Amino acid sequence: DGTAYLEEYNFKLLPGTGPYVIKDEDIVNQESYTVTKRDSWWREDHRTQMYMYNFDKVTISVVKDNPALQFEKLKKGEADAIVIRKPSIWVDETDFEAANKGWVQKRRVHSSVPAGTWGYAFNMRKWPFDDKRVRYAFSYLYDREKFNSEILYNEYALQNSLYSGSEYENQNNNKFEFNPSKAVELLKEAGYKVRNDRGYLVHEETNKELSFTIEVGKPAEYRVTPMQQILKEYGIDMQIKFVDPTTRWKNLMDRNFTIDFQGWGGLVYPNPETSFKSSLADQKNNNNVSGLKSERLDELLPIYDTEFDHARRVEIIQEIDGIVSDIHPSAWGLSREPPARLLYWDKFGYPDYMLTKYGGRFEDILYHWWFDTEKDKALQNAMKNNGSLPLGETEHTFWKDQ
């Protein structure tokens, strides 16, 4: 069953040929791990790797499901750089002494990384989301504009496609704007017309209460609780159960879930087969998490994979996007990747673009930045004398300006 393998190797790095190694003694279970650059890397002088991997040693702290703790470690100098994923921290809490004096720099780095999205994935294999009308009703009760303005500080954009903002987006997709009247109408069509003494809708034939459970990590609580409250107002009981990421992922891959709050990363070149091929729908451990099946999609997928004309490929993906939107295996929410929000102590050098065009991720720091001795001296001097350093522009728009 793999238990012996996991016990032996779960916290060991298998041999590889990359620029860094992780030594067994540099792994502190559940706390940190340190990568050390090889003395002589075989690909170091290759033209595609020049000026990369500039740090001799990097320690990565492990902070699970606690963005506030991650932020505090940065403020105390226990971390040199972090990405801020929670909008409220970025907007309300980054006005601290080190940031105001320029010791810690604050950047929103724009890139061309495909946005992706996050939202609610339905398990269409089982009740109640095996009924398309219930899936649609859920989406009509998903007040994304309100969530964005009141909870997410308008840091995100509404998504109505797997490929929002790109040429692949099907502009005819249903926008699913907040429409409680439409939701109630659909629920009645699905058989949910009256409420029980708890105030929740029950099916007219089975008398089954419209109630289900969503499993999330604690950091997602502030995003799903408002949805729970709206659903309750309209007679739907969504129970929230907090689980660790490992448990949630196992249940998702085993298809042991009813609804899941998740994110979908964007791709420069779409690869829909791994998520929507019908033969994957009833198998475990793949990306067709909702159990989507469509004969037309199965016809289009091999055509797309063997088509070399770009314009035609775009047409195919747009049709696929429309089919998926209509079947509605997920209630798409808001863009998953706004500009990267970075905080870092001002001791680093970096290329003009800061983060790569189609990566735009925190990990780019490890690949492309370097330790700047002169900057570090200036930082230490400013901290010693309670001085200030130049703040720099918060909005970093190198790729947008090209």
State what each model feature region is.
Residues D1-K57, A68-L69, K76, N179-E189, ...:
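Gly/Pro-rich hinge or "lid" segments in bacterial periplasmic/extracellular proteins
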Residues G18-K23, E31-T34, F55-V62, K208-G217, ...:
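Short, well-ordered beta-strand elements
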Residues D26, Q30-Y33, G116-W118, A137-K175, ...:
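Detector for C-terminal structural segments
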Residues D56, E78-D80, V104, D130-R135, ...:
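Loop/turn elements at helix/coil->beta-strand transitions in domains of secreted/extracellular proteins
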